Structures are given as structure tokens and as C-alpha cells.
Amino acid sequence: AQKWTTQTEIIKSIVLDEWQTITFDFKNDTFLKFNESSPDPVNRTDLNRVLIQINGEDNNAKVTAYIDDFLYDGTISDGNDNNGVDPVFDQLVWSDEFNGTGAIDNGKWFQQTRPIINGFDWANGEIQHYTNRTDNSYVSNGTLKILAKKETYTSYEVYTSGVTKGYTSARLNSKYAFTYGKVEIKAKMPFGVGTFPALWMLGQNITETGGYWAATHGTTGWPDCGEVDIIEHWGNNQDFVQSAMHNRSSFGGTVNKGGRSINNASTEFHIYTLDWNSNKMTFSVDGIVHYVYNPEDKNIQNWPYNAPQYLLFNVAILPNIASNFTQSAMEIDYVRVYQSNTLNTKDILANSFKVYPNPASSEINI
């Protein structure tokens, strides 16, 4: 829809050649919705700016409007309390649309292949090798494929004698890390009980052997670095997806979590979204929120999420994989990271007042 269709308008009459006080009561004033099917303003959370427009009968005539005082009679949050206004992240700062063909973009992604547990295993009892081959991760027809396969494969990542396993897959680390923003991923899950795909994040400071950031930023172990599972998909219910948080206060057993059932998780693309600000993390699928992580008393135990995190995409294989499994892929149409919220409470609290254009002729933006 065009941007103006989301507008809500309150009209006030003004008089000429004298001072007057004009009050806008956004809760009780009569309003006009440009899109009649949209919710009433008091029920919306996506309105993020106020535009004051002064119109004369002839908009081509030059009109000088004087504003002496501008007062907001209410509370503006600094974003550090649970009642604050959520920032709106609307500027694309990093993405991969996966429009090429062949190998992944090495400028954006790192293939993590070295096992993290004793140089042999991965977490959760996974039984696959991760490889950097295009057999397991590649781009085609506008999507990234992370392909888990049943095959005998020997890895020499740690042991010169080699370690042989019966499955292969891929685990990607983003070469981009960020603090706060919106992550949007359009993806389709693989088929099969025993496949364990995940779209998730780890703290850039994790000391994980073989990870992309460990050598340059690794100072903290897991779970103190903080883990954010944007979406995971496993188990007997193949249309169930879940988001979860791991940190010093709760890890391993997955205490902080929330999920929902969706239709056709493995046959249709769905949009998985994380909104991350200094106050909370909100998880949604196709625009429907299913989990919010928002500890009331944030501390180092439960909130290490004020530092950069990076993205990980992988498909693991669990021990309960069906014996007739051969291969299946997680497909990702795009991943996009947005930042630079349009509503900046620091700017509001600075009590700055800006008028465009200056001098004003027909329109004032505040």
C-alpha cells in the first residue's frame, strides 16, 4: 500500500492574525482514517511520527505561520522501561537476496566446519559433518539451499586420521554482526523427523573454536555470550516452529521459549522475524507474534543482548533421523537486517524543534 494509506488525520480550525492555542488529543479527538479498514489509532502501534500541516484556502499563496511553543503533555520513554515506545527499524543495512548461481557469497558468509566439542562432535547429539562443499550449500533459482544428505563422509578438520560420519550438511556464519534491529528471513524448512534446521544468532564475542569471529572477538564462552534462536524446526510435529533464548540464567533445557504451528512449514515459504531493541526481543511468523522475551530485571545473567550478534543458518541431523532419509534442504529466499529507527527517543528528549522548509510557505514538519 502507499504510505499515505496508513495515515490518520485530525483537522483543527485556525484563525488568522491572532495567537491561539491548538490542542491535539490523540486519544479522544475525532479523526479521519485514510484507510477505513485500518484499526483506530489508539489500537495501533505502527504510527511513528506526527506531521502538522497548515493549509490556507489557496495553497499557492505564501503564508507565514508562527509557532511560539510546542508542548507534549505526557511521558516519553527513554527505551529503558517496559512501557516505552518500541523503535521502528525501517532502514535496510545488510541483506542477501541469494540471486546468484553456485557457491555462496564468501564476502557475506563463512562456512563453519570444525566440530566444537572435543574436535569431534556438535551440540544436541548431532551426527552430521558440516562441510564447505557446494554439495551442501549453494545458490540457485533465487534461493540459498542448505542441503542435508545421507552419505559417508570423512572429515580431517581436527584429526589427521579422519573422522567418518554418515551425514553431511552446512553451517553458515554471517560476516556481519550488529546490535539491535529487525531481522527478516523468508525460508522454507526441510522435510523429515530428525532434521534440525535453525535460523539463529550468537554473540560476536563467543570463544567457539572454528567460528568466524572467535579469533578476532572471542572473549566469552557459551551461554554467557547469549544465543537467540530466531526459529528452530524439529520433532514429530513438522508444522511446529519455535523461538528460544539461551543465556547464563537459562540454557540447555530451553526454559525461555515460545512457538506455534504453521501450515506447510516444509512446502511453503514463511517470513520469520525478530525485532530486537534494548528492552525486549519479539518473535513472529508471517507477522503474527508467538513469543516475547522481556525480563523485568535485566542483568548480566539474563540480558547479554546489548552487544553485537551474528547470524547462523544450519541444518543438523539428530540421532532419530529416519532410516529411509536421503536428503532434504532448507531454502532461504532472503535475509534482511534493518536498523535506524524513525522514532528516536533521544532526539525527542533533546527537545529539538525543526521546521522544513524555512521560511515556511505552506507546510511545517515537526
Sequence positions of predicted segments:
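Extracellular ligand-binding interfaces
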Residues: 1-38, 46, 57-66, 71-73, ...
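Noncatalytic modules at the cell exterior or secretory-pathway interfaces
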Residues: 44-51
